[in-house]
A protein has these predicted regions:
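Bacterial signal peptide processing site
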Residues: 25-28
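N-terminal low-complexity, Pro/Thr/Ser-rich intrinsically disordered segments
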Residues: 32-69
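Bacterial N-terminal signal peptides that target proteins for export
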Residues: 1-11
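C-terminal motif of bacterial Sec signal peptides marking the signal peptidase cleavage site
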Residues: 20-23
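Acidic, glycine-anchored loop motifs typical of Ca2+
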Residues: 79-83
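Domain-level detector of nuclease and nuclease-like folds
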Residues: 114-240
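Hydrophobic helical h-region of N-terminal Sec-dependent signal peptides
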Residues: 12-17
Length: 240
């Protein structure tokens, strides 16, 4: 055996003995950094800290924006057979009734409406309930979405993480507003609302303006324990 090979053999023997002395049974007991359950970050996290970490830039021009840039409205991105709007209504309303195909929500109750804190009855065709994008599509367009793939824009427009059933007139008063220009009248919901916007912007790597980040800080400073919501759909919608 060459001197080099003799050295390697002795080193391996020493390592084995060291593991035995420390109570380890072998290298298989050491954590594998490639395993997702070892490397995954802890769930939750502070919404305020996440807001601090968002990229800050100026708002880009709205040139080229139209609703169709984010795909047809309320497509079935999760492939459960139902459109996104009906999925959100079924998930966020109480006392839901559906048609015979099991998808279309015919009636229900939004209690409370997060934006106003009131009780709203939903009836299909005479609805006072909208499905709002927490981060408006046009706001996203001006803060990074112009450069996305079509699939990513479809995913964003239909991601449950970015969608909330809310009073229609209040939602329409929001328009394209971000945190700096609009907050829900229901002050009890503002921390959750802003945390939702932060989560969506973090997930989709959208930037914020300085005024927007300052407004996020101001709201979340009043609820520093507010957790960052997570989940929703993948950030690339399947091809249709």
């Amino acid at each position: 055996m060459s001197p080099r090979n003799r050295f390697l053999a002795l080193a391996a023997l020493a390592l084995t003995g060291s593991l035995a002395l420390t109570g380890c049974e072998g290298l298989d007991d050491l954590p594998d950094p490639a395993r997702s359950d070892d490397a995954a970050p802890a769930p939750g996290g502070s919404a305020l800290e996440a807001a601090e970490g968002l990229t800050v830039k100026g708002r880009a021009p709205k040139t080229g924006y139209e609703r169709g840039e984010f795909g047809s409205a309320w497509i079935d991105t999760d492939r459960n057979g139902c459109g996104t709007r009906d999925d959100i209504l079924a998930d966020q309303l109480d006392d839901v009734s559906r048609d015979d195909d099991g998808c279309k929500v015919l009636s229900g109750v939004l209690d409370p409406d997060p934006y106003t804190g009131t009780r709203i009855t939903f009836e299909r065709g005479r609805s006072k309930v909208d499905i709002d994008h927490l981060v408006a599509l046009s706001d996203a367009w001006q803060k990074g979405a112009q450069k996305w793939s079509d699939g990513k824009r479809r995913a964003f427009a239909n991601d449950p993480l970015n969608l909330v059933a809310a009073d229609s007139s209040t939602n329409r008063s929001k328009g394209e507003g971000d945190t700096a220009t609009w907050l829900p009248p229901n002050k009890a919901y503002r921390c959750e609302y802003v945390a939702g916007q932060v989560s969506v912007k973090k997930k989709y790597e959208l930037w914020v303006t300085r005024a927007e980040q300052d407004a996020m800080r101001e709201v979340l400073a009043g609820c520093p324990e507010q957790k960052l919501p997570s989940g929703g759909n993948p950030t690339e919608a399947p091809t249709r």
